[in-house]
Curated annotation (Swiss-Prot):
Cellular component annotations (GO), alphabetically ordered: chromatin; endoplasmic reticulum; endoplasmic reticulum membrane; Golgi apparatus; Golgi membrane; mitochondrion; nuclear membrane; nucleoplasm
Glycosylation sites: 366
Membrane-related topology note: Single-pass type II membrane protein
Protein's name according to its UniProt entry: Cyclic AMP-responsive element-binding protein 3-like protein 4
Length: 395
């Protein structure tokens, strides 16, 4: 380090006006007086050592600047003076002093820087979310320098209305109770657990932690309660199941009785139908017998009428009856035995008449007739009576 003694003193004794000045505090909305920057004991010791060395007229040795810086600079405060251009905090840049050489400055801790950045983000989100109130918890490291923001300027609530003010006044800040930050350590017991613990003869404290024996007893009691509840649930489900079965049995029995009544009615109806069927069968049998009798009677009547009426319509009656004049006897072979004497006389007269009527060339016919008579064994008598036996066939 090539810093001169006056420049080094000016750099380390100069208060951080850019961050914690009155204007900057009012700009952030912290209505509190600017903090005074006291000189710590380490700084006083360092200055005294430096002054004593300066009185002797000797400068800093090679290892003395590092020791001197370690007395004044905390690693949590050192950061680069050149802030990023996209930061929203607005406190990362400091007006440069052309006369003074660049020297490290003590600024806010990283946690404080993060809180200021979140305030700027909340200001940007105001138009989207509306006027709501959020919580900000400012936490610092174990090493907190005296020139940081005092306790009166720390806030716990931050409204989103950042146009009017970012942080509320010191009088409106509500401190957060410690009970909300710590977990509840109270032991809560139900009436059933208390009753079982009383039966066991064990009294548990109302605050945690418990001893191992007390934890075992409490687990045992809670296990008993769970077993009891599970048994009650199983009995309840079993009872509901049995009740459902009983209701189903009652419904089935009622339906069975109704079906039995319907079956009895159907049986009676079936019996009546069977009786009607038998009656119909008997009626059909009687009507069939009567129909057969009537049909036979009608057939007999028609046959008799046919026998009576058909002879009158015989084809023989349509021919005219042949007279005695038109009748011409012909020789017919007959097998009948004729013994009557009138038959022979008639035959003779017929033969004579035929001879008279026939021409002379008809001898053969007469001869045949005579031969026929001779064959018949008849002999002519002078009286004209011939007795003979003729055999003729009936046609």
């Amino acid at each position: 380090m090539d810093l001169g003694i006056p420049d080094l003193l000016d750099a380390w004794l100069e208060p951080p006006e850019d961050i914690f000045s009155t204007g900057s505090v009012l700009e952030l909305g912290l209505h509190c007086p600017p903090p005074e920057v006291p000189v710590t004991r380490l700084q006083e010791q360092g200055l005294q050592g430096w002054k004593s060395g300066g009185d002797r007229g000797c400068g800093l040795q090679e290892s003395e600047p590092e020791d001197f810086l370690k007395l004044f600079i905390d690693p949590n405060e050192v950061y680069c003076s050149e802030a990023s251009p996209g930061s929203d905090s607005g406190i990362s840049e400091d007006p440069c002093h052309p006369d003074s050489p660049p020297a490290p400055r003590a600024t806010s801790s990283p946690m404080l820087y993060e809180v200021v950045y979140e305030a700027g983000a909340l200001e940007r989100m105001q138009g989207e979310t509306g006027p709501n109130v959020g919580l900000i918890s400012i936490q610092l490291d174990q090493w907190s320098p005296a020139f940081m923001v005092p306790d009166s300027c720390m806030v716990s609530e931050l409204p989103f209305d950042a146009h009017a003010h970012i942080l509320p006044r010191a009088g409106t800040v509500a401190p957060v109770p410690c009970t909300t930050l710590l977990p509840c350590q109270t032991l809560f017991l139900t009436d059933e657990e208390k009753r079982l613990l009383g039966q066991e003869g064990v009294s548990l404290p109302s605050h945690l932690p418990l001893t191992k024996a007390e934890e075992r007893v409490l687990k045992k009691v809670r296990r008993k309660i769970r077993n009891k509840q599970s048994a009650q649930d199983s009995r309840r489900r079993k009872k509901e199941y049995i009740d459902g079965l009983e209701s189903r049995v009652a419904a089935c029995s009622a339906q069975n009785q109704e079906l039995q009544k319907k079956v009895q009615e159907l049986e009676r109806h079936n019996i009546s139908l069977v009786a009607q069927l038998r009656q119909l069968q008997t009626l059909i049998a009687q009507t069939s017998n009567k129909a057969a009798q009537t049909s036979t009677c009608v057939l007999i009547l028609l046959f008799s009428l046919a026998l009576i009426i058909l002879p009158s319509f015989s084809p023989f009656q349509s021919r005219p009856e042949a007279g005695s004049e038109d009748y011409q006897p012909h020789g017919v072979t007959s097998r009948n035995i004729l013994t009557h004497k009138d038959v022979t006389e008639n035959l003779e007269t017929q033969v004579v008449e035929s001879r008279l009527r026939e021409p002379p060339g008809a001898k053969d016919a007469n001869g045949s007739t005579r031969t026929l008579l001779e064959k018949m064994g008849g002999k002519p008598r002078p009286s004209g009576r011939i007795r003979s036996v003729l055999h003729a066939d009936e046609m």
